[in-house]
């Protein structure tokens, strides 16, 4: 099955990346509004119904701005490290799932493995 990866937005005004296989998808960061995320996905012919989870790379606003709204609206689990969750302003706790770098997470037919990166954040 083919894997589709695209940037819905990138830069200091917000980061959001879609990774999917036609059946299952995840978003990496939602640093743009829920409405803008939905709009950009629709423009690309991507269904929000395939999104099964959100992964948060770190707590900076340009990576988390729309996470809570989108996760609440679609009841999506949010995979986030404990350190990032503690630093992220206004991140929802009831949909949060803790994860760690180098420990794979299975989302449908996708296997997501995070890795540590140097950055000025709690746990990038």
Where are the predicted features?
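Metallo-beta-lactamase
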Residues: 80-124
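Conserved beta-strand hairpin/beta-sheet module of binuclear metal-dependent hydrolase folds
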Residues: 1-44
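Short, structured coil segments at secondary-structure junctions
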Residues: 1, 73-74, 91-94
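A generic local structural motif
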Residues: 13-14, 39-43, 64-65, 98-100, ...
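Active-site metal-binding motif and surrounding structural segment of the metallo-beta-lactamase
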Residues: 34-83
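Short beta->alpha connector loops
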Residues: 10-12, 32-34, 60-61, 117-121
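Divalent metal-coordination and catalytic microenvironments
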Residues: 19, 29, 58, 112, ...
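Generic preference for hydrophobic
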Residues: 5, 54, 78, 112-114
């Amino acid at each position: 099955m083919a894997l589709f990866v695209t940037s819905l937005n990138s830069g200091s005004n917000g980061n959001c990346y879609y990774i999917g296989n036609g059946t299952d998808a995840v978003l990496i960061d939602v640093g743009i509004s829920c409405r803008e995320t939905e709009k950009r996905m629709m423009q690309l012919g991507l269904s929000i119904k395939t999104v099964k989870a959100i992964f948060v790379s770190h707590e900076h606003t340009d990576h988390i701005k729309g996470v809570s709204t989108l996760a609440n609206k679609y009841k999506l689990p949010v995979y986030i490290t404990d350190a990032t969750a503690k630093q992220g302003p206004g991140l929802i706790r009831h949909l949060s799932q803790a994860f760690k770098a180098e420990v794979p997470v299975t989302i449908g037919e996708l296997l997501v493995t995070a890795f540590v990166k140097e950055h000025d954040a709690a746990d990038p």
